[in-house]
Every structure is written in C-alpha cells, then in structure tokens.
C-alpha cells in the first residue's frame, strides 16, 4: 500500500516531491485541495499554491486521511510514510500505489520530463526524524504538557497530531506513537546548522517535560 520512487539517475525522490509533481495533473478548479500529514516537509507550503492548490495539514493514519478526503473533496493526499491517495482515480478512497505510479508515469510522458530534473526544481531542506523512549503511561501526558508549555511561550502551535511548533526557518513536531512506548520528533530547517540547533533545543524541552511529569 506504499510506493517509493527512484529517479532516472538512481536517486530517491521524497514523497512530498512526488506529491507536488503528480498534483499538477490532479488539481482542478473544483477539487484543488491537497492533504498532507503533519510530519511532511514545509516545501508543500511553498509549492502547492504555485500550482493552484490549497494545502491542508491532517492527522497521520489511513482512517483519518480518508475522512478528510471526503470532508474536503480533495484532489489527493500524501503521508511521509509513502502512502498516496487520489480519490478521483479510484472507485473507493484508499492508498493505491499502482495507480499513483501510473499517474506519475503518464505525467512524465505527456510533458516529456524526466523525474530527476523535476525533483531538482523543487527545493530540499535538511530533515530528520528521531524517537525517544517514553512509557505508554506518560507519552500522552508529555504531549499535553508540551502543548501547554509551547502555547504559553507564544509559539505558533499546531495540535492536529502531537504538537507541531513553527519556528523562524523551520519547525519541529513532537508526536506520541500510537503503537509503541516512544515519542517521535520530526525536525526540518532551512540549513544544517539550524536543524542541529532545533534538535538540541527541543530534545531538552522533551527531557524537561518527562522529568516534570514523572
């Protein structure tokens, strides 16, 4: 139920870039919304409006994605885990890697483009995912603590799924796993030094939250 893509020079292409490319042939005036799981790259915020789309951040998970697709009459949805949904191409709403791959191939054929060039035309930013041990009995309490803490500090906070904090030049998402005793941290920044700074700062916030609750 997933698909990953390697370009014509042997390099992997991120799900976000694939979503942007395929969206060019799926977005219509009647259905221009693109849904993305909150851990996805901020390149979507820059690139989707350029092709006439409206980006909506959503919660991770197939059930939630399908509900949001119906709610918004969206053209497509994607997750960082390489799940892609294109409801206009299938009789039912589900993540169909085969038809999405065919749609990409069709776009490349019609435009005479190669995937490596299309990928290079879209910016890339340093991105990292980490996970920290956190007992099941604590992880959701930690999430609530961090949400309150960051909100009180005046950060721009998104709480669709975990707590996502928007920063100057990047963002960080702290999200309790639904299946494991861990908290995951996703970080993206405009450059590598910025990424390392965010990682260090927000890992400390996580450690402080665990100590405060334990």
Predicted segments, located by residue:
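Short Gly/Thr/Asp-enriched flexible loops that form oxyanion-binding sites at enzyme active sites
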Residues: 2-19, 44-45
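Phosphate-binding and adjacent anionic-ligand microenvironments
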Residues: 6, 28-214
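Short, acidic/small-residue loops that bind anionic groups at enzyme active sites
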Residues: 11-29, 33, 59-60
């Amino acid at each position: 139920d997933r698909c990953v893509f390697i370009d014509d020079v042997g390099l992997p292409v991120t799900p976000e870039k694939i979503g942007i490319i395929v969206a060019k042939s799926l977005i219509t005036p009647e259905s221009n919304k693109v849904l993305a799981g909150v851990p996805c790259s901020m390149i979507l915020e820059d690139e989707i409006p350029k092709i006439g789309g409206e980006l909506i951040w959503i919660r991770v998970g197939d059930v939630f994605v399908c509900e949001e697709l119906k709610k918004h009459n969206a053209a497509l949805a994607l997750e960082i885990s390489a799940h892609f949904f294109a409801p206009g191409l299938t009789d039912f709403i589900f993540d169909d890697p085969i038809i999405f791959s065919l749609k990409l191939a069709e776009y490349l054929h019609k435009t005479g483009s190669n995937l490596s060039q299309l990928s290079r035309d879209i910016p890339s930013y340093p991105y990292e995912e980490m996970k920290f041990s956190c007992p099941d009995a604590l992880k959701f309490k930690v999430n609530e603590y961090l949400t309150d803490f960051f909100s009180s500090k005046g950060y721009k906070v998104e709480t669709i799924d975990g707590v996502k904090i928007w920063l100057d030049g990047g963002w960080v998402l702290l999200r309790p796993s639904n299946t494991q005793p861990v908290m995951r941290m996703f970080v993206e920044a405009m450059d590598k030094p910025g990424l390392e700074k965010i990682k260090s700062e927000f890992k400390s916030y996580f450690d402080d939250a665990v100590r405060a609750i334990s």
